[in-house]
């Protein structure tokens, strides 16, 4: 998520009532989950195992629970609960984003009982079938078909375990569906935590498929019914994923790969490979 205005790091430290360490002249231009951070962003980390990954990322400012050596040109916001601080900042700044009513092209067909959220754009010659729910910050390009009762852009399944239970990460991202995508009935595509979940042009998705937050799917890919794709997965172009496949978070399926039905994919799949089984391996 990008801020409407850059925020000086000393203001952020004051807002969070936390210690500031490192470059005190920085301005934050946004706040993002670690998988999608850019220069100028705030990211968070709360486990020593991932400190270095966060410090080496593109993020300029890191929310972290303790002081550690800081790379040049970066800063730390030292807070005992980085997850809570991250959620607080998202909540504080998402309210400043401009929200507009859905914009629907005159040639699009919208069936009864469709819900359209704020900052939704539906382009020419789209068809949105009855009962579909298109949540905030969803961009749908031309020629897209969305089946009955599908939900596009609901919140990410992202929680922090605490002694009292689970706290949800606030989702403020969106979904971008490129031209000529077809999505079947009863599908769910989660929006990004702070970034964008993307479906590439010409991709076809069967009924009852789930796609997790921040996943990136390329062009002309086929996904058959009953698949469950976790968050932050990268799927290339011209991939074929047959029925009831499950995919672990953060893996990559490269171009022209084929995943046979009922496979459980836990590791990256090379370009052009054909995988089957649980855990899936080369055929």
Regions found by a protein language model. Give the residues of each.
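Structural signal for interior beta-strand "rungs" in well-ordered beta-sheet cores
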Residues: 44, 103-282
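Terminal amphipathic alpha-helical/low-complexity segments used for targeting or macromolecular assembly
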Residues: 1-102, 106-107, 143, 149-150, ...
